[in-house]
Amino acid sequence: MRKQNLIEMEGIVTESLPNAMFRVCLDNGCQVLAHISGKIRKNYIRILLGDRVKVELSPYDLTKGRITYRLRTRSPS
């Protein structure tokens, strides 16, 4: 699939499922089922509950997506 056709959104991980699958609540309130992209898996980046992530969605099926980036959390100061 070409990169232009993907929809990129941000959300929060609400549930961890088997086989590196996660349930993500997007900023617009929708729930999607997302798996980890290959680069995140290759670099051993851990994704935990409550993490903010970027998710790519296909315009053909808006219920499934791919986690492409884990956003940094700001430390309270």
UniProtKB/Swiss-Prot annotation:
Domain S1-like span(s) in chain numbering: 1-72
Keywords (A to Z) from UniProt: Chloroplast, Initiation factor, Plastid, Protein biosynthesis, RNA-binding, rRNA-binding
Transmembrane segments annotated in the record for this chain: none
GO CC annotations, alphabetized: chloroplast; cytosol
CDD domains per the UniProt record, alphabetical: S1_IF1 (cd04451)
Domain of life, per lineage: Eukaryota
InterPro entries named in the record: NA-bd_OB-fold, RNA-binding_domain_S1_IF1, S1_domain, TIF_IF1
Cell location: Plastid, Chloroplast
Pfam family, one: eIF-1a
Gene Ontology molecular function terms on file: ribosome binding; rRNA binding; translation initiation factor activity
SUPFAM superfamilies: Nucleic acid-binding proteins (SSF50249)
Amino-acid biosynthesis keyword on record: no
Signal peptide: none
Family under the similarity heading: Belongs to the IF-1 family.
Summary of the function given for this chain in its UniProt record: One of the essential components for the initiation of protein synthesis. Stabilizes the binding of IF-2 and IF-3 on the 30S subunit to which N-formylmethionyl-tRNA(fMet) subsequently binds. Helps modulate mRNA selection, yielding the 30S pre-initiation complex (PIC). Upon addition of the 50S ribosomal subunit IF-1, IF-2 and IF-3 are released leaving the mature 70S translation initiation complex.
Record note on quaternary structure: Component of the 30S ribosomal translation pre-initiation complex which assembles on the 30S ribosome in the order IF-2 and IF-3, IF-1 and N-formylmethionyl-tRNA(fMet); mRNA recruitment can occur at any time during PIC assembly.
NCBIfam families: infA (TIGR00008)
Protein name from the UniProt record: Translation initiation factor IF-1, chloroplastic
Gene: infA
